[in-house]
Amino acid sequence: MLIIETLPMLRREVRRWRQDGKRVALVPTMGNLHDGHMTLVDEARERADIVIVSIFVNPMQFERADDLARYPRTLQEDCEKLNRRGVDLVFSPAPADIYPHGVDGQTFVDVPSLSTLLEGASRPGHFRGVSTIVSKLFNLVQPDLACFGEKDYQQLALIRKMVADMGYDIDIIGVPTVRAKDGLALSSRNGYLTAEERKIAPLLSKVMQQIAERLGQGERHVEEMMISAENTLAENGLRADGLAIVDADTLLPLNVDSQRAVILMAAWLGKARLIDNQQVDLTQ
């Protein structure tokens, strides 16, 4: 497995594989890899000849400097996991290589509406950072396909829209969320939880499942369901930071024509911001 830090070396290797007619997959990450990331890698391996994993803690995605500073960096352990998984290349650039003029001097990519809706409203600039770095990685690697987790539902929707709008010839593969046995969605930020908080955290997915069951039974009292969910979370020490039940295709409020809903949930538990989502078929 190659570990590359510079843009010219990355381009050289990608060019070589391209000349050999290889199909290339990209898995963008910020490192601190867990089993959810490995599922993305496995999906990429099934679909391509060459798997490239990027590890870059993107400063443009962080609103607070202290959050950026404490994000776990575990490059050596990550590379060992990826090597065992049969990854061909790890691209781990320094911020100065990605943003030579600094974040403030960087040309950015913005996806209208999806960047400021829902999760974007509570995290200004976050999705601009996502779309900018993903676009840059797409330009550098020029993959045939890229794999993203469905846990970050709005991010996946935003990337798909960006790819369509910008004319990228890249297949975007959404991979189902990987969960612990108690239902908690795997996340790098779960490491921020104390032992006691970890016992409480699965409540987020349980509340989400309760909403899904009510929607599946034909209930459409969205506001009442969200208030009830927020109260249940608060009673157990979770502070809601974005609860929504919206059309799964548009991320806009449900209407009579909506065929699928998605429940989007975000909540703080101690120092960890947990997110999760679940899609619901409304046609049955």
Curated annotation (Swiss-Prot):
Catalytic activity from the UniProt record: (R)-pantoate + beta-alanine + ATP = (R)-pantothenate + AMP + diphosphate + H(+)
Flavoprotein listed as a keyword: no
Entry EC no(s): 6.3.2.1
Subcellular location: Cytoplasm
Main location: cytoplasm
Protein's pathway: Cofactor biosynthesis; (R)-pantothenate biosynthesis; (R)-pantothenate from (R)-pantoate and beta-alanine: step 1/1
Pfam families: Pantoate_ligase
Any GO BP annotation: pantothenate biosynthetic process
Residues the record lists as binding ATP: 30-37, 149-152, 178, 186-189
Record keyword Flavoprotein present: no
GO CC list: cytosol
Active site feature: 37
Keywords associated with the record: ATP-binding, Cytoplasm, Ligase, Nucleotide-binding, Pantothenate biosynthesis
Amino-acid positions noted as binding (R)-pantoate in the UniProt annotation, renumbered to this chain: 61, 155
Chain sites annotated for binding beta-alanine: 61
Molecular function per GO: ATP binding; pantoate-beta-alanine ligase activity
Remarks, miscellaneous: The reaction proceeds by a bi uni uni bi ping pong mechanism.
Function: Catalyzes the condensation of pantoate with beta-alanine in an ATP-dependent reaction via a pantoyl-adenylate intermediate.
UniProt-listed HAMAP family: PanC
Subunit structure: Homodimer.
Family label: Belongs to the pantothenate synthetase family.
Name of the featured protein: Pantothenate synthetase
